[in-house]
């Protein structure tokens, strides 16, 4: 990154801007205070691109400067350049990322020995920015409220896209802002030209900016006729990071106002943000109870929510909890680092959360109305993390990019602790364990969370992985600090770190991994070197296989813990999302890292012995195999643990004698003889019960205190897992049991299905466990068990949610939110019921269709939009066979008739959603996905042509993004007109959200093509099956080769890499100045995968193009002379003037390979350039 030459990190910057909505222009001046430490300072370098620099002053004197726009510079202007020169452009990009620069200011005289501060003043303007600042509702076809906001992030070079500065996360300074804008919406809509602004009342104003900026403005009125509410006049508010100082009327234009802000806490330009528009506001601290207000006293912080009109109810409903989060963080981690907290909701932001000092800009997409249930947790977690990042992320920042994991880990960790207080310990531990299971799927061949060489800007998939693993690492570190070290753990470490920032002991507020570990070591008095090497700088995770045996002679439990991660390491799965990054790593010859052979550390083993007492044993793992001899403690008769609770003795019924007695446990529902017969329940037999009674202990839990991120499997009998599920009150233990029941190594039984059913119907269980039990019942729905799992699941659903002896559902009632979530989990489980051929039974499909057809939400106070989407998804999933059967799914006429019924029902819901839109049009989005899946499986007419109308402007943004993604998954890159259309949208669409989403969709589409196309091409003609053994063998070889990353790259190069139109369009998009830096970077990565780099260039020689010909001359008297005719010069056509791009007309014709053609010409030059 560029830096001010010899300028300390902390300085001061003043920014004065005038916002013109009509022309999407910002005109401004910035004053940067430079404190030189070199008396011979001759040049100052600032970061800036996408702006126009009009003049530069140093201490009031006009100064020479040079300016180079990175967006315009990052291109190859040579007209004969091709996509094969992508490596040359990539070198330019890497150089820019290391030192963006842009503005070079040449000092007329050095500061001298006095080293007085220099005031660098820059007059600049930004017209129709494509990155950094977003204007919404300005275009005539856009009927949303006009507003503008900064669209930056922690990623470098976002703020300098509209403001000259030293753009780096470590370049912190104090700030002042003067923002001039219209007072009201009617003033904003006024058409007359804006007068030149005097932003700083003369002295530091913009003097003589170019008139071209006035002449090039959009000459149109805002078209708001279709939105009657928009015609109401609203005050234009500006919300900025820092503190509001003053607001005055503009001295020259009474329709404008100037608002003043100050940021007294030094922050980097990445954390500078503002938003302006017709925002309303709500004081979210009004929801605080009076007693809570008194308890907080002077520590109470004001929280204000800003929103566009019509979002008042959604903001109140979504943010009602925020004052509790603020109070929690203040009590636990010290005073809030700023004076107030503001939350502003806007449209069209690429990031769900943009955190800056005292201000968070958030997307309207995280808001939800009162009748929506499914988004509650996700939105609550997102906003809680946004607030947590004020302490850790804005106030406390990483010292290097390799320390970024700490910021994500600590902020998400304290976010989770608040959610634990808000939603309960069971919810916290359950979700934490689910995150571990998710990590086990993803952390295969992944780099460490602390990477020395990380590519900037950081890939979103990498950030998501860091955000997932980092808080889990902090959690297990907390467990070890509190258990082994005997300290208060993170509850002491985090406040100490924040106190060091406040006191100035932590330089510039930058936290490094080494400093964090040293602080933890001081707090716990234990060394963390080994922990850091394994979990922070190491790869992978341990895989434990535990065996145990009770030795009756020695009265000990012999146990062996084997680490098998080097033997049973799962293969890294290929996916569409990860294909591009995997391909780049392959081309860089980066080997897939393997996990460590041995992970060491303490582990807690809890043995529930026969008397019902749990005994804990802490062991230290040091080797790949650890052998343990654990002393057995029980000397009394065992307590019968209620496996068959048919004849349950109540507490106290044993009359004080020493005989066995039964303790009631969870899952003791459906115990009567009538229930057992009606529900087809199976308990253990008397012989099995007697065998179980001889066991020395009830069950064993390894890693009982959740101190490890690991794949763990304990070898113990089925009935011990049943005891663990029914008698262990820890939701993690219950979740581990159900996960064991669904593992491939476990053989299910009718008794397990019975236990899962009772778990599902017992509302004393945490609802997440009931959901998992519902999903696990599908595992028991197999012919070998007479489909008992299906019978149990079906009976449970019909009993709870349908009319008696019918598959017609009752009217929806979602007032009990836990029952609603369990109901949804049961529906998700139905399509997983399969026969030996991978086909869902017809009764399951008919049940799901009835539930969809007869869904009734008339008497429900909550929306059923998500529920309908779930029904559609489950029904479509059930229709699609798995395994080899999918190839012949279209051959059954009866099944195809049922498929058509499903499509008709989906179309009905799409028509309803068009007339009465659901929340975010989610029904339309889900229906499009469902229809494409059916089309690809059953060879129906639904593909890019049918999806195209949904991609056009006027549709909801989410619908457009989904439609583009589905088009590319359906093979849109096979059609030349669609290739041109896609890249036109990628560089010219008004919506930054659509542009960014389309970029990632193109990457996913490449992954789909590389891994085997689009399942089956969508065809309108009858399918022709050719019984050709050779072709079948070739197809099998092609599928096998695409399974490896090298084979997938080669196949993609032979397919899409030979498409000249794609090569032309992607190269034009890369060289287009409208493409932002991230888009250029990702497209260059695609080029590297598709095309081999060539350091050669076609040279065009300016010589006449001549065509020789012969002519016959009749001399008379039968004499003919054949001579060489005068050479005719071919005039070259003049190139037409380039005009503004227009959307290409689209006629979808599949690209057909051309056959070989032999051409013979008499010419002195080739008409086409030679291949090279």
UniProtKB/Swiss-Prot annotation:
GO terms for molecular function: chromatin binding; RNA polymerase II general transcription initiation factor activity; transcription cis-regulatory region binding. The keyword Nucleus applies. Keywords: Cytoplasm, Nucleus, Transcription, Transcription regulation. One of its GO terms (biological process) is transcription initiation at RNA polymerase II promoter. CDD domains: M1_like_TAF2. Residues 1145-1154 have a biased composition (Low complexity). It comes from the Eukaryota. Signal peptide: none annotated. GO terms for cellular component: cell division site; chromatin; cytosol; nucleus; transcription factor TFIID complex. Its main location: cytoplasm. It is found in: Cytoplasm; Nucleus. Residues 1131-1172 are annotated as: Disordered. It holds the Pfam family TAF2_3rd. InterPro entries: Aminopeptidase_N-like_N_sf, Peptidase_M4/M1_CTD_sf, TAF2. Component of the DNA-binding general transcription factor complex TFIID. Belongs to the TAF2 family. Functions as a component of the DNA-binding general transcription factor complex TFIID. Binding of TFIID to a promoter (with or without TATA element) is the initial step in pre-initiation complex (PIC) formation. TFIID plays a key role in the regulation of gene expression by RNA polymerase II through different activities such as transcription activator interaction, core promoter recognition and selectivity, TFIIA and TFIIB interaction, chromatin modification (histone acetylation by taf1), facilitation of DNA opening and initiation of transcription. This is Transcription initiation factor TFIID subunit 2. It comes from Schizosaccharomyces pombe (strain 972 / ATCC 24843). The lineage of its organism: Eukaryota, Fungi, Dikarya, Ascomycota, Taphrinomycotina. The gene is taf2.
